[in-house]
Amino acid sequence: MRKSFYSWLMTQRNPKSNAPVAILADLVFDDTTFPKHTNDFELISRYLEDQASFSFNLGQFDEIWEDYLAHQYVDKKESYRLF
């Protein structure tokens, strides 16, 4: 089962980093209305565009999403190796 985007993003938190993923993770951490239990790109993208209490470059979000998907693929491959 795929980790929610929020769960994965929280593993990327690093207040000392200027990396876009770390910045987004810190912003989302402080946003109490962020959709935490989904991995639906459209829902999260619309939220960031229309409802988030902060602004973030959506082009960077697209890149972060691709990284999230890549990590999900790697995690899935690793779980198959356990069997």
From Swiss-Prot:
InterPro entries: UPF0346, YozE_SAM-like, YozE_SAM-like_sf. Pfam families: YozE_SAM_like. Belongs to the UPF0346 family. This is UPF0346 protein M28_Spy0369. The lineage of its organism: Bacteria, Bacillati, Bacillota, Bacilli, Lactobacillales.
